[in-house]
Amino acid sequence: MNASTPNPMGTDGFEFVEYTAEDPQLLRTLFGRLGFPVVAQHRSKNVTLHRQGDVNFIINAEKDSFAQAFARQHGPSACAMAFRVKDAAFAYRRALELGAKPGPQSAGPMELNIPCIEGIGGSLIYLVDLYGERSIYDVDFRPEPPSTQAEVAGLTCIDHLTHNVMRGRMDVWAGFYEKLFNFREVRYFDIEGKQTGLLSRAMTSPCGKIRIPINESQDDKSQIEEYLREYHGEGIQHIALATNDIYGTVDVLRSHGVSFQSAPDSYYEGVDARVQGHRESLQALRQRAILIDGNPGKGEGVLLQIFTQNVIGPIFFEIIQRKGNEGFGEGNFRALFESIELDQVRRGVL
């Protein structure tokens, strides 16, 4: 975003994403494979903190919690995310004044009361102003001894995460982020596969660190609609994790048993013509099914990305490396869309 874009909420990036499942061991196993060891345990609740780089994942398995109620409704899911802000109390008051719905306040004795509002699909958006050297985890969590088993995969931060919404609701949620946090649209996509299509508005915070593409289907059979049916509503579709070496990261994750979506063989035949001057090894890309996009000839750099299979209900992860490109892989959307359509055909959805 432009440095002059007003930032009334003082946003400064993602602090964490919170996950839940009726069987939380599924999440613990997955996070182990992704290279996220348990680094802390909540002092009084069945909640664990998993970290790699500047990415914080929380598993909430507390029995009588909002998270577990969310899991009963949606299945394995991402029930909350947290934004870093300059002043959480101010941001919370301002959000309510602008029409946000307050989230549940459930802090116990000697626990931080982190303000939150209702977000996509009834999930929560926490507002956190303690991060970095002084963090929310210092109060509520007890550090765990370093794991000798977890092999990190080089993931550095949350690059972006996406929302899937009902048809006709994309502009509603874009407006939500515009009104409350002064997000701006930085990309608009209209993607048509061979049988299905989607619309997407990529929204970015004034600080430039919180990016949320919002996806809407153009028909009743796309992967967006499949997600909405399986998830029983709108929600977070995928979380994109950044790396400085996507080849090494993918190799480590595959060795841990993480499965990725494939790319059509024909995709790599057109890479040199579509992304001229990219300087990547086609063999290395093809071998790992990594996608590439960008326009280095116009000084826009390249972007490398790959997507896991669905791993938390209908939710999946993206691994992304930016080499001077600030897009979302628009040129890859069609290739990804077609590869997911092929999977839908195999599973009898299409």
Specify the residue positions occupied by each region the protein language model found.
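Loop-centered beta-sheet repeat module
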Residues: 151-205
